[in-house]
Amino acid sequence: VPVPAGLRPAQARVFTTGLWHHRACRALASSTVTGALSRLLGASDPAIGAAALGAVTALPEAIGPVSFRDLAWPMARLLDDGVHLNLLSLEALAAAEHLGAVLCLATADENPSLLAAAAIRGNPTRLIHA
């Protein structure tokens, strides 16, 4: 899938964390989970839904996974530093810090607590309009 112009620099890598990947898989696997992603896919052409399911269950090579093994200690340190976030947000902030990366969120999933914690710690963030 081509990346829209201006979305990210040509050499930039995209990563996801284990919990966020699990969340996407769960949204697609369960008919009882209703969120933004499952609603969009439920209303789409079946071929689009099948392609999305394949892309989520078999994470594309272009998306690098960040191991919980690499994030458990940084997450514990964030908590010790007084960061108060839920587990998914804590993992995302730890991953961004671990990778020295920009923390990107969809505007539909804007998370004021995560954005504030990142700002306090000097981590760059970006809201992506999907």
Q: How would you describe each model-predicted region?
A:
Residues A58-A106:
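Active-site neighborhoods of divalent-metal-dependent phosphate/nucleic-acid chemistry enzymes
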Residues T16-T17, H21, L93, E97-A130:
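Acidic, PIN/NYN-like endoribonuclease modules and their adjacent C-terminal/linker elements
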Residues A43-S67:
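Extended, non-globular alpha-helical segments
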Residues V1-L40, S44:
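Short, well-structured N-terminal submotif of metal-dependent ribonuclease cores
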Residues C25, A29-T32, T57-P60, A76:
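Amphipathic alpha-helical segments within well-ordered protein domains
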Residues P9-R13, T57-I63, I120-T125:
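Structural alpha-beta junctions
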